[in-house]
Swiss-Prot record:
The UniProt record lists the keyword Iron: yes
Entry protein name: Iron-regulated 31 kDa protein
Compartmental location: Periplasm
Transmembrane portions of the chain: none
Function in brief: May be involved in iron uptake.
Leader sequence segment: none
Cellular component terms per the entry's GO annotation: periplasmic space
Record's keyword annotation contains Cell membrane: no
Keywords of this entry: Iron, Periplasm
Domain of life of the source: Bacteria
Main subcellular location of this protein, as a coarse class: periplasm
Length: 24
């Protein structure tokens, strides 16, 4: 369960980075 939460957090962080690059 913790692994799933960690993976989701990492994916969310990557998604934010991609979104930031797209916004820039």
């Amino acid at each position: 369960k913790f692994k799933v939460v960690t993976t989701f957090t990492v994916i969310q962080d990557i998604a934010q980075n991609v979104a930031g690059d797209a916004a820039t």
